[in-house]
A protein has these predicted regions:
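Membrane-proximal alpha-helical signals and transmembrane carboxylates
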Residues: 2-387
Length: 387
């Protein structure tokens, strides 16, 4: 009797612990949001929010051919706020939107210049949106980017996401997630900088494509201007985000202009100093690389020739950094490089005196740029194959 009683208790407990499926959503009832674009609306205080999503039931598998209908669904709604746009989006689709896989947020230029605080709050506060998704800018409309189909994949969000992943390895543009963007908006010293993407003009025989082209510079929550690709790389040197790109330099006393170096590793130290009562920044950059191309028969088989190349690459890095600083400090006058936070940390008492007027002080900060390059290898051969 005792064993029978225990058996009944176990059965009852097992039944109680079973989970039900009363709130399950079948795959054919879902659409997976992959990207969100936000533009300025036609009327004041309106925004246009574009949602790009995948409809799984229309995707092809080895056992099922693709549907004749596209598996990409793009919807644009005009709304007063981000929350309002979600309500209107639900009215425009017969399926349940899933936001867990959203990778991309694209902001149009007109809206970014007016300020992003109002809708960034709505995105970050709403549970549906991922804070780890990348935030990007475009000079035109974000809706155009998300409606664009690219040759490599029908899903422009996947294509853009892959571009950003690759950029981390080739030192071309900064990567800013929604989370890091919000942290900089909340900072008292550092403003955000965001990668710019664009629809590239079609080349002969090919469709138009999507690519990145420098970055947008913010002052607080407003876009104030753009950096070119070269100026952006100067910024990446300063902020220690350079990754593994390629440097080109000439060789003194020769016609060579295209000796190529693969960046292997680098590090940057931003060191605030006080000289004669004046705050300045010492920017120390160390870079290690390998020769990857030598096109003009330059002999690099001696310590002197290696040193000359190292000096040439150091000069090129310094040029990129100074060009970027000139644009950032003198034209845009906004601290996107983190000098203020470094001064605050090292000289807290002096920082109190300049914090309220940092926007006026930052453009006048003197920056001393020191670069050291170390070439650790010339590749598989020493000299050029061209005599």
């Amino acid at each position: 009797v005792k064993k029978k009683f225990i058996f009944i208790i176990v059965i009852i407990l097992s039944i109680i612990s079973l989970t039900g499926c009363w709130d399950s959503i079948e795959l054919n009832q879902r659409e997976i949001v992959t990207a969100v674009g936000i533009d300025k609306g036609d009327e004041k205080s309106n925004i246009i929010v574009t949602f790009q999503s995948i409809i799984p039931e229309r995707a092809s598998t080895p056992l099922r051919p693709a549907s004749e209908k596209s598996n990409i669904h793009v919807v644009s709604v005009t709304a007063k706020s981000i929350t309002d746009s979600l309500v209107k989006y639900h009215k425009r689709t017969s399926k349940t939107p899933e936001f867990q896989h959203n990778r991309i947020y694209v902001i149009g230029e007109d809206l970014a210049r007016e300020g992003v605080n109002s809708f960034i709050d709505g995105i970050f506060r709403t549970y549906e949106f991922r804070s780890r998704g990348w935030i990007l800018l475009c000079k035109g409309k974000a809706s155009d980017i998300l409606h664009k189909r690219v040759e490599a994949t029908a899903i422009s969000a996947d294509y853009i996401g892959n571009l950003i992943n690759i950029s981390n390895h080739v030192a071309t543009v900064p990567t800013e997630t929604l989370h890091t963007f919000l942290m900089k908006l909340s900072s008292k010293t550092t403003s955000p900088v965001v990668t710019q993407i664009e629809i590239e003009a079609p080349k002969e025989g090919n469709a138009a494509d999507i690519g990145y082209n420098g970055c947008g510079v913010f002052k607080k929550d407003k876009l104030v201007g753009w950096l070119t690709m070269n100026e952006t790389r100067g910024l990446l040197w300063i902020t220690n985000q350079i990754g593994k790109g390629v440097l080109l330099s000439g060789y003194p006393g020769t016609a060579s202009e295209n000796i190529s170096e693969q960046i292997v590793r680098s590090k940057v130290k931003i060191n605030p100093k006080i000289t004669n009562g004046k705050i300045m920044i010492s920017l120390d950059i160390w870079e290690e690389g390998e020769i990857r191309e030598n096109d003009k028969g330059v002999y690099i088989n001696s310590p002197e020739s290696i040193k000359a190349l190292e000096d040439g690459f150091a000069t090129e890095i310094k040029r990129e950094v100074k060009e970027s600083l000139q644009k950032i400090q003198k034209e845009y006058k906004t601290d996107i490089v983190g000098f203020g936070s470094k001064i605050h940390k090292k000289f807290p008492s002096q920082w109190k005196n300049i914090e309220a007027k940092w926007d006026e002080v930052f453009p006048e900060i003197e920056v001393e740029v020191n670069v050291e390059v170390k070439l650790r290898s010339t590749g598989k051969i020493i000299n050029s194959i061209t005599p």
